[in-house]
Regions:
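Paired small-residue
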Residues: 6, 77-84, 92-101, 289-297
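Helix-breaking motifs and short loop linkers at transmembrane-helix boundaries and internal kinks
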Residues: 34, 66, 87-93, 231, ...
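Conserved MFS/SLC helix-loop-helix module at the cytosolic interface between two early adjacent transmembrane helices
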Residues: 53-92
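Helix-to-loop junctions at the C-terminal end of transmembrane segments
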Residues: 55-67, 251-263, 347-348
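Cytoplasmic helix-loop-helix junction between adjacent transmembrane helices
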Residues: 97-135
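Intracellular juxtamembrane helix-capping segments at the cytosolic ends
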Residues: 108-120, 304-317
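C-terminal membrane-cytosol helix-exit motif in multi-pass small-molecule transporters
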Residues: 164-184, 370-374
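C-terminal transmembrane helical hairpin of 12-TM major facilitator-type secondary transporters
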Residues: 265-309
């Protein structure tokens, strides 16, 4: 296993922790800053929008840079953003700090995925991307529950200080072991933008948007759902987040292998499973053990899609891998924002936390429809890999 993949996974762990840990700390942040749970949920939306907006601009701004230099600069922005989160004096400053942190997110994962795929033979690309994204799933296995526990014990700001420390270690690792690609072709802006033509590419992005919307409609409000519906204590929420993280990790590994097998077939099955497990939580969420089992299966289904979606979008934009890969991360976070908004809308309109899983299931069905349309378009275009 190349050491570079391990360092990329560590970087993904740091970024994933700061993105997702806010969900476990939502009640704490809301109470400390004197805002409602839905208002605190906008910190998730703000981060996601920061990724969506920053991703294409950062990708284009670093297009002429060697990929190693770009990743180092992006990790530096990440560290600064988390420093600002740790010292934020109020809700507005924390929101701004979250957006600053988010600016590096899309481009880092996009460029990092291209680097990861370039380190292995072509028939193992999805598995290599999955290995990098293992850092993201481990952020949910370890980073989110430990960060939540730390935030509950020592204040939510302490969690962001811990993320800063991890970011510094990741930055050093990138500098030391990431290979310099001296044969990298200099990017041509016109060629990069031309790669965005075609219905298939935009359908592939829509798959990512609806998938992420489904996932985050539920994930954003999982802590209050567990506490208020299932009756789990704050300490118990940490344990459930750990279980969800294990499911995400398992799904990521399985998803990488499935994507190397048959891309579209795998995604169809994954989105069906995501829709079913999301809907099931509407009823299983009333009791502890059924809720835990459902959330584990839901998490496995959710992250099984990630490596497949990343490889799928590059299939439609081979002439600009950095840009299209980064745009896919941006699409993921557009979906993140959409999902958090939909979940908050459901709650604000009096439908209750138990209606959120049904909304998530509906969004998963939209991802399934987009997948079928994308596969059809791929067959028409002769892109066998995507179909």
């Amino acid at each position: 296993m190349p050491a570079s993949l391990i360092v990329l996974a560590l970087s993904a762990f740091a970024i994933g922790t700061t993105e997702f840990v806010i969900m476990g700390l939502l009640p704490n942040v809301a109470a400390d800053l004197g805002v409602s749970i839905p208002s605190a949920g906008w910190l998730v939306t703000g981060y996601a929008l920061g990724v969506a907006i920053g991703a294409p601009f950062m990708a284009l701004a670093t297009a002429h840079w060697p990929r190693k230099r770009a990743l180092l600069a992006l990790m530096g922005i990440f560290i600064v953003g988390n420093l600002l989160c740790a010292v934020a004096s109020g809700y507005d400053m924390l929101m701004l700090a979250r957006v600053v942190t988010a600016l590096c997110h899309g481009a880092f994962f996009g460029i990092g995925a291209v680097v990861a795929a370039s380190l292995v033979p072509e028939n193992r690309r999805a598995s290599a991307v999955a290995l990098m994204f293992t850092g993201l799933t481990l952020a949910n296995v370890l980073g989110v529950p430990l960060g939540t526990a730390l935030g509950q014990a020592a204040g939510w700001r302490s969690t962001f200080w811990a993320v800063v420390a991890i970011g510094v270690v990741a930055l050093f690792g990138l500098w030391r072991v990431l290979p310099a690609d001296r044969n990298q072709t200099r990017a041509d802006l016109r060629q990069e933008l031309l790669a965005l033509r075609g219905l298939g590419f935009w359908l592939a992005l829509s798959m990512t948007v609806f998938f992420a919307a489904s996932m985050f409609a539920l994930f954003t409000y999982v802590a209050p759902l567990l506490q208020e519906v299932t009756g789990v204590s704050p300490r118990g929420v940490t344990g459930t987040l750990l279980l969800i993280g294990l499911g995400l990790t398992l799904g990521n590994v399985i998803g990488g292998r499935l994507a190397d097998w048959r891309l579209a077939t795998s995604l169809v099955g994954i989105f069906v499973a995501l829709a079913l497990t999301s809907a099931a939580l509407r009823w299983t969420g009333q009791a502890f053990l059924p809720a835990e089992i459902t959330l584990f299966l839901w998490a496995a289904a959710a992250f099984a899609a990630v490596p497949a979606l990343q490889i799928n979008v590059v299939t439609f934009g081979k002439d600009a891998p950095n840009l299209v890969s980064t745009l896919n991360i941006g699409a993921f976070n557009v979906g993140n924002a959409l999902g958090a908004w939909v979940g908050g809308l459901v709650i604000d309109h009096g439908l209750g936390l138990t209606a959120v899983p049904l909304a998530a299931s509906g969004l998963a069905l939209l991802a399934l429809i987009a997948t079928l349309l994308t596969a059809s378009q791929a067959r028409k275009s002769g892109l066998a890999t995507a179909s």
